[in-house]
Regions:
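Intrinsic-disorder-associated, low-complexity terminal segments enriched in Asp/Asn/His/Tyr and depleted
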Residues: 5-9
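Intrinsically disordered or compositionally simple regulatory linkers and C-terminal tails
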Residues: 11, 15-16
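Interaction-mediating elements
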Residues: 19-141
Length: 141
């Protein structure tokens, strides 16, 4: 499992705007639907920027103090090769370790877009079909 606490990674890398633009999107207006789209685009942009390949589809939900993002596809060719050889655990371990390393970027993008502090962040991946799940816990309002 990959979990990142806000206190563990206070520094930020790419801004939400940079991540969204790298996914081909634009910054949102102040509607809930556009914020969900912006969060999804920021996660796509982060994966694209850091893995060299992005998901094929993404959707985000914002519910009270929680943000859930589901990303479809986006495995790299070397990850697909390892999966074909039965090494799903190795791919999962690498992905989750990498997400811990770049968690501050994901958290920073969500904080910037929603204007709320992220208390903790968790990432998980499954392979059949390939899906990545990004979960953020927001500070209560």
């Amino acid at each position: 499992m990959c979990g990142v606490n806000y206190q563990d990674h206070p520094s930020r890398e790419a801004s939400a705007r940079e991540l969204i633009e790298s996914a081909g999107g634009r910054m949102p207006q102040e509607t809930e639907g556009s914020l969900r789209t912006a969060v999804a685009n920021a996660m796509v942009g982060m994966k694209k920027q850091l893995y060299g390949r992005g998901p094929t589809a993404a959707k985000a939900w914002i519910l009270d103090d929680y943000v859930f993002v589901v990303l479809e596809g986006g495995l790299t060719r070397n990850e697909e090769t390892l999966l074909a050889d039965g090494k799903a655990d190795l791919v999962r371990e690498y992905r989750l370790s990498f997400q811990e390393t770049v968690g501050a970027t994901a958290m920073g993008a969500v904080e910037e877009l929603l204007e709320r502090r992220v208390l903790t962040y968790h990432s998980q991946i499954v392979f059949d079909p390939p899906r990545t799940f990004e979960i953020f816990v927001l500070e209560p309002q």
